[in-house]
Amino acid sequence: MLSKSCRAISQRSFSQSSLVFANYGKPQNPPIDTEIKLKIQPIVRTGETIEVKRARLLYQSRKRGILESDLLLSRFADKYLKTMTMEELDEYDKLLDEADWDIYYWATKNYKITPLPDKWKDSKILKEIQKIANNEEKVIMRMPELNLEPESNTK
């Protein structure tokens, strides 16, 4: 007959090896969400004149980093930025604070990939960008010239 200490050792070894065997091949750490979600707060600009704001928004519309967004936003800026009110410029500025791919999917109405937030559902600016994305005129899109000067009729 086995002594008490020998039985305790064999039970401990058996129960420990059972746990190791039961977990064999399973991941030992919980799964890690590999997508990092980081929202950088936009810079609060105070005392910016309307001309400076238009120039900054024109640059930010064109230099996004994603060609598709650059094309849509720079064409929008070229067409509308010169005549927008300060309130419209503020709304457009807030739209440009969103992620590039989100803006692109909203502009192309691809809401399955990136759902449209409630705050942009009634946006006239986004609707105009969506019209540009539809390209109803069937023109070949290219980057417009960087120019904030009004077009002159004198030649």
Swiss-Prot record:
Asked if Mitochondrion is a keyword of the record, the answer is: yes
Location in or out of the cell: Mitochondrion matrix
Anything else known:
This protein may be expected to contain an N-terminal transit peptide but none has been predicted.
Provide the assembly information. Interacts with the flavoprotein subunit within the SDH catalytic dimer.
Q: Which family does it belong to?
A: Belongs to the SDHAF2 family.
Provenance organism: Candida dubliniensis (strain CD36 / ATCC MYA-646 / CBS 7987 / NCPF 3949 / NRRL Y-17841) (Yeast)
Classification via Pfam families? Sdh5 (PF03937)
Q: What does this protein do?
A: Plays an essential role in the assembly of succinate dehydrogenase (SDH), an enzyme complex (also referred to as respiratory complex II) that is a component of both the tricarboxylic acid (TCA) cycle and the mitochondrial electron transport chain, and which couples the oxidation of succinate to fumarate with the reduction of ubiquinone (coenzyme Q) to ubiquinol. Required for flavinylation (covalent attachment of FAD) of the flavoprotein subunit of the SDH catalytic dimer.
**Cellular-component GO terms for this entry:** mitochondrial matrix
PANTHER family, from UniProt?
PROTEIN EMI5 HOMOLOG, MITOCHONDRIAL (PTHR12469), SUCCINATE DEHYDROGENASE ASSEMBLY FACTOR 2, MITOCHONDRIAL (PTHR12469:SF2)
UniProt keyword Signal, yes or no = no
Name the GO terms of the biological process aspect: mitochondrial electron transport, succinate to ubiquinone; mitochondrial respiratory chain complex II assembly; protein-FAD linkage; tricarboxylic acid cycle
Query: According to the lineage, what is the superkingdom?
Result: Eukaryota
Q: Which UniProt keywords apply?
A: Chaperone, Mitochondrion
Q: What is this protein called?
A: Succinate dehydrogenase assembly factor 2, mitochondrial
